[in-house]
């Protein structure tokens, strides 16, 4: 599988209005993404910040062509809007990875798996790279995946 990854640092909610996003930001990005999709490349989009107001706009691609990696987006809403066409991943807060308790980490991961894992297409991961993660929190994340992160037929 060949993949192109994009770090989207300026498209987040609050950086520009929805009208500005749809006029200036999205058309050129979509044109590049469409070209790579035509070449058979999966698009991995790291949407830094919240993309809650952008979800309907970015849901314009063929099924299986895009994985959206979210930092601070409502994942249940992202699953509802994008889940039929796109994979989604992320949204375990770096602050939780670094300063949370293993119990809080496991509970948060379980919630994400239960909200987003139904029907497939969800990858549990941190929302961004965490500096100095607590090893016990990473273990709790793995435990949550082992306990709750499987697909039932």
Task: Name what the model sees in each region.
Residues 1-153:
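Active-site loop segments of alpha/beta catalytic cores
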